[in-house]
From Swiss-Prot:
Taxonomic lineage from the root: Bacteria, Bacillati, Bacillota, Clostridia, Peptostreptococcales
Gene: rplA
GO biological process: regulation of translation; translation
Membership in a protein family: Belongs to the universal ribosomal protein uL1 family.
Annotated source species: Alkaliphilus metalliredigens (strain QYMF)
Function: Binds directly to 23S rRNA. The L1 stalk is quite mobile in the ribosome, and is involved in E site tRNA release.
UniProt-recorded Gene Ontology molecular function terms: rRNA binding; structural constituent of ribosome; tRNA binding
Protein name: Large ribosomal subunit protein uL1
SUPFAM superfamilies documented for this protein: Ribosomal protein L1
Alphabetical list of InterPro entries matching this protein: Ribosom_uL1_bac-type, Ribosomal_uL1, Ribosomal_uL1-like, Ribosomal_uL1/biogenesis, Ribosomal_uL1_3-a/b-sand, Ribosomal_uL1_CS
């Protein structure tokens, strides 16, 4: 295991590594341990008691964080006709069809964070499944990125909408803000995420749902959150 730097070691002294804190306490501590010279991203990591290999135990969705993430996402939209103008007016960074497919395939171009598509464009987008899928960029109705309401979709993403989904180890990783955010802003974003994940609990999930929860800054250590406190 690589040796951690002096700032990291100092950050460890700010809290008890063996203790699990309530969400609000964890937010206070994660701000204290974010000591890098840049504005670190604060992330939540949530391990769930489900098995993502089973279709009936998937946990996926999207929410608009009350205070955004501190980053304005670049949005690419697949649309045609009048929907192109709608997407552009809503603030989409890139709008197109086959031309964007060619650019992504030919140039290995990925200068965007979220992909949105109208349902009638999914045949075109499907050609990019092998490259968008592994990057978590494939549009999906559950996350609101396959829709004819492009104005709403683009504006919500620009306002701080984030998608959450399980990785192969049944963990959700979601940014909830920046170290420069006020504690109350981070706490509210964190609470909004936890409530959404709680509501998304699959009927097939058995036993303890929230297995472990932590928050961390880009360069800082993870702060454990008491799983029994996340729904309070």
């Amino acid at each position: 295991m690589p040796k951690r730097g002096k700032k990291y070691q100092e950050a460890l002294k700010q809290f008890d590594r063996e203790k699990s804190y309530d969400p609000n306490e964890a937010v206070v501590l994660v701000k204290k341990t974010a000591t890098a010279k840049f504005d670190e991203t604060i992330e939540a990591h949530i391990k769930l008691g489900v098995d993502s290999r089973h279709a009936d135990q998937q946990v996926r969705g999207a929410i608009v964080l009350p205070h955004g993430t501190g980053k304005t996402a670049k949005v690419l939209v697949f649309a045609k006709g009048e929907k192109v103008t709608e997407a552009e007016k809503a603030g989409a960074d890139y709008v197109g069809s086959d031309d964007l497919v060619a650019k992504i395939q030919g140039e290995n171009w990925f200068d965007f964070d979220v992909v949105v598509a109208t349902p009638d464009m999914m045949g075109v987008v499907g050609r990019l499944g092998r490259v968008l899928g592994p990057k978590g960029l494939m549009p999906n109705p559950k996350s609101g990125t396959v829709t004819f309401d492009l104005e709403r979709a683009v504006k919500e993403i620009k306002a701080g909408k984030v998608e959450y989904r399980l990785d192969k180890t049944n963990i959700i990783h979601v940014p909830i803000g920046k170290a420069s955010f006020e504690e109350a802003q981070l706490a509210e974003n964190f609470k909004t995420l936890l409530e959404a994940v709680a509501k998304a609990k699959p009927a097939a999930a058995k036993g303890q749902y929230f297995k472990s929860v932590s928050v961390t800054s880009t360069m800082g250590p993870g702060i454990r959150v008491n799983p029994s406190k996340v729904s309070e």
